[in-house]
Every structure is written in structure tokens, then in C-alpha cells.
Curated annotation (Swiss-Prot):
Native source organism of the sequence: Coxiella burnetii (strain RSA 493 / Nine Mile phase I)
Binding site for S-adenosyl-L-methionine: 57, 59, 77, 93, 122
MF (Gene Ontology): rRNA (uridine-2'-O-)-methyltransferase activity
EC number in record: 2.1.1.166
Primary location group: cytoplasm
Lineage start: Bacteria, Pseudomonadati, Pseudomonadota, Gammaproteobacteria, Legionellales
Record's protein name: Ribosomal RNA large subunit methyltransferase E
Length: 212
């Protein structure tokens, strides 16, 4: 059986996939974020959130439900995403200056401080099937997400990002820790057991110029 056929079979049998269809979420990824929120209380009413790599929208939908009508959710992705009520969507690469400037302008317009309370990223690279290549690409996306968070995350804010376990992750953690009071690894039960994906949860941002 090819990798693609095996994935399709697993996908069709996956209880989280079935649950997402039943409950109206665009993807099973919503349950990873819900589980993390239930344990760590990421979201509060009226929070301002950036969702990087948001398509197809599972995390954005969860975020908007939890921050409520007075909160702001800005979603960004290279891929198109179905329109969601009260979610601002930017299609493009946030690493490109023009797109980042657009993101920054929206944050400035929609928030009092020009910063957000929470930056979340469930980004994953296009999977090649070559483990070390995919892991390296995943880590690169994490570094891009962190670059964005440095510029737009408010002091006291939270950064949540997915990464594939492997070389370079420990080094990234060493570089990240001085900027946050709390940093931990998470593996939600909705993550497939054979997947190398984990989540880095960094809380109580000290500010980018605040090095310990």
C-alpha cells in the first residue's frame, strides 16, 4: 500500500475527522487547539489573535468562538480560506514585506496597542516523505512564525507553534526561553500517535528587547 493510500484510509477512519464533519469544523486540527485551551486557558474574551498558516480555518474558527464578538482574529495563509464571520483573512506570505505590512496595519487598526495577545501557528510544510527534509522545513516555518511574533506579540502574550521533532528544536528552545517566563512541549491526544508533531507553548512574553 502506498503512503498516500494508507493516509487516505486512516483519514477516513479517523474519529476526529468524523467529529469535525459532524460539528462543522473545517479540519480535525480544531480539536488539538481546543484540547490545549481546555488545559492551559489560552483564550479569553476580547483577546486579539493572529493565526499563521490558518487554512483551512479550524484554528481560526476555534479562536473566534473563544474570544467572542469583541475579540479580533486575523488569519493568514498562502492558500485560500473560506470566509468566516468576524475573522479577517489575508492571503499571502507573511514573510514578504508587503504582506507583513498589511498584517501590521490591520493589527494597528484593530487593537489599541498595535500588538496582539496570542500568536498561534499550526503550519506544516508540504510533506515530501523524507523525514529529515520535512523536519528541517518544519523548523524553518517555526522560525518564521517566531520572527512574526517578536514584532507583534504584546508583553505578557502567548506564542503557540507546531514543530516536527528532530535536530535543531532543542537549539530553538534555548534561544526562545529567555523571552518567556514559561515554555513547554505539548502533544495533544488529537495528534496522530505516529506523527512527530509537537507543540511549543510559550507564555508570558517578556518583550523582544528583554533578554535574560
Amino acid at each position: 500500500m502506498t503512503h498516500s493510500k494508507r493516509w487516505l484510509e486512516e483519514h477516513e477512519k479517523d474519529p476526529y475527522v468524523k467529529r469535525a464533519k459532524k460539528e462543522g469544523y473545517p479540519s480535525r486540527a480544531a480539536y488539538k487547539l481546543l484540547e490545549i485551551h481546555q488545559k492551559y486557558k489560552l483564550f479569553k474574551p476580547s483577546m486579539n489573535v493572529i493565526d499563521l498558516g490558518a487554512a483551512p480555518g479550524g484554528w481560526s474558527q476555534v479562536a473566534k468562538d473563544l474570544v467572542g464578538p469583541k475579540g479580533v482574529v486575523i488569519a493568514i495563509d498562502l492558500l485560500p480560506m473560506q470566509s468566516m464571520l468576524d475573522v479577517i483573512f489575508i492571503q499571502g506570505d507573511f514573510n514578504e514585506p508587503e504582506i507583513f505590512n498589511q498584517l501590521e496595519a490591520i493589527v494597528a487598526k484593530k487593537t489599541l496597542t498595535g500588538q496582539v495577545d496570542l500568536v498561534i501557528s499550526d503550519m506544516a510544510p508540504n510533506i515530501s516523505g523524507i523525514k529529515n527534509v520535512d523536519q528541517s522545513r518544519s523548523l524553518h516555518l517555526v522560525e518564521l512564525a517566531w520572527d512574526c511574533a517578536q514584532k507583534l506579540l504584546a508583553r505578557g502574550g502567548t506564542f503557540l507553534v507546531k514543530v516536527f521533532q528532530g535536530p535543531g528544536v532543542d537549539r530553538f528552545l534555548i534561544n526562545l526561553r529567555p523571552y518567556f517566563n514559561q515554555v513547554k512541549f505539548l502533544k495533544p491526544s488529537a495528534s496522530r500517535s505516529r506523527s512527530s508533531e509537537i507543540y511549543i507553548l510559550a507564555g508570558e512574553f517578556l518583550g523582544y528587547n528583554q533578554r535574560v
